[in-house]
Amino acid sequence: METRVLLQPAYLLHRAPFQNTSLLVDFFTYNYGRVKAVAKGARRERSKYRSLLQPFHPLLISFSGRGEVKTINGVETGLSAIVLERERLFSGLYVNELLIRLLYNYQEHTALYKNYQETLINLQGSKEIEAVLRRFELNLLTELGYAVNLEEDFRSHLTIDPKSNYRFTPDMGFELSETNPKLEESPHYFSGQHLIALREFDLRDEAVAKSAKRLLRQALAVHLGEKPINSRVLFTGKV
């Protein structure tokens, strides 16, 4: 059965040359999640798609097709383009790459779409990059069914104690440590105080920000596999 969709809100996640004059594109859409499609002739100098198919530009796309890869029938501008520069640009590309790597095609994620849009707006503004990225990573894991529970010990169900240390196991959670490891030498152990700060998205303290980044890298790594994040290779300062 052929799919026909008109004026679907979307953001471009990635594009790559396809055949002589076309582009193979990945979109994150409001109702259909990740959509892979061909934009025919988009690389031609006079193509109407050429200037529109840019990351972080709110779009309205129309597409059709029977198979996994659809055909783009129309692209229109939506709201004003979100402009990201320097580390905020690479942070946005990092977020896009997470979606490409972790989302399946044609699975609806309307809540995540709204969160993605909010993340881009916050990156464009003056909000602290670390807090914006950690919030998105936590929301992404929750949407995929792998929520990180920052409220309690997964075995005892006791509330996280700011004076205790916890061992983190991806996709399971935090378990009270019976020992008192040196946290800087024990990558899987975290301070309860730092976990509470992350829960409240208060990453102003450098040590808390580093712990939060380490935690989310571990939580994501089991789903991303061994292939490195390209945007992290390009810019290692923030993501």
Predicted regions span which residues?
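Non-catalytic alpha-helical scaffolds and adjoining flexible linkers that form interface surfaces
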Residues: M1-L23, F28-V239
